[in-house]
Structure formats: structure tokens, C-alpha cells
Amino acid sequence: HFKLLDKLSKQDTVGDMYLNYSTNLTIAPKQDTIDKWKKFKYVEFALSFDGIEDTWELIRYPSKWKKAERITQKIFELTKEFDCRIGLRSTVSVNNILNMPESFTWWIDNWNKHASTSFDINQWINPTHLTFPEQLSTTVLPLKYKDRVAEKLNKRNIFEGKMKDSIEAQINYMYSKDDSHLLPKLKFYNEFLDNKRKQNFYIANPELKGMFDGL
């Protein structure tokens, strides 16, 4: 990547080129890289911003939230230096659907603190639902727990524009089919990772306690 970036940045037509990155926010860009980005017409960053705090660390192990937070803020600050276009492109699963309101609130607050513009309700916000591994899909939740998720999300969906639409879309997808036959597979998957990583799924998702009872 760096060799290609260096070569492109030296082209006479660099000002007509744009770049698109997807990042999981584990590595901060170096100044030399930033200086090269400034030569391009614009740079797009699709941030895999899957949650905050305990939710982030559950999904992005062994990444730590505080480091990811600083990197995200740094990317927001790049909007003050050159034309960079930043999008929230999270993948929504059983592990993080409950954290959508909190992560959206963090995004708005920190965008307004660190970016060159005020948050726009119609800017690039594009969460997508997880399809693989299938046992992590929100469609696996039993109806009782889907109702709990929907109750929290509907209550806290005080957003406007694309964020509001995104939460509603995730609720609709969650209810779109019943994959609860995969619940034992989800139980095995989460317990295996919790034991291996010394984590606890329920710290990030207390509303789902009891979901595996009887399995």
C-alpha cells in the first residue's frame, strides 16, 4: 500500500485521483502518509465503527477502546487539513445492535468536537447487517429478546436522518426471519471466545442475560 501510495502521489495527475479506505481503526495514520493524502483530489474513509467501550472491546479484541477512540478523533481532525470524506460503516450483529444509540451519540458529539464541519444528519452513515458467521446475525435472537432489543432501540432512537433510518432498518431486519434454531451455535461460539479471551458477552449486552438458559 505505502509503495503504491508513494508512486501515485508523485504522478502529475494525482490531483484528479481519489482514494477509498476501509479501516478498523486499530492503526493511526503517520504524518508522511497524511502528507501524501493531501495531494489527492479527496480521500474517503469508511470506518468500521462497530460500537464503543465494552462493545468495541468485545468485537475488536484485542484492540482497546481508548486507542480506537483517539484514532477515530484523529481521522475526524483530518477534515481540517484536506478534503476527506468520512463514513460510519459498522456491521450490526447480536454483539453490538444494543449499542447503536450510544455509538451514534458518541459519533455526533465527537464529530462536532473534532471535525471541520458540524454533524449533518444526512452525511455518510451506512451500517449494514452481519450475514457471516450466521450465528451472530440478529435474526438468531428469540422473539422475547428481539422485543427487548427493539424496545431499547425505539426508546433511544432520538436521532434524525440516516441514523434514525439505520436503527429502524436494523430492527426491521432483526424481525425479518426466525433463525433461533442457530441459538445453540451462538451459545457455543460466544462461550468459546469468552473463555479464550477472558471476556464476558453480557457485560456489553446485559439485556440479553438468560438467552441461553435451558440450552
What are these regions (language model features)?
Residues 1, 9-30, 38-70, 85-94, ...:
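Core AdoMet radical
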Residues 11-13, 39-40, 71-86, 110, ...:
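A structural motif corresponding to the C-terminal end of an alpha-helix
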Residues 94-111:
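Catalytic cores of alpha/beta
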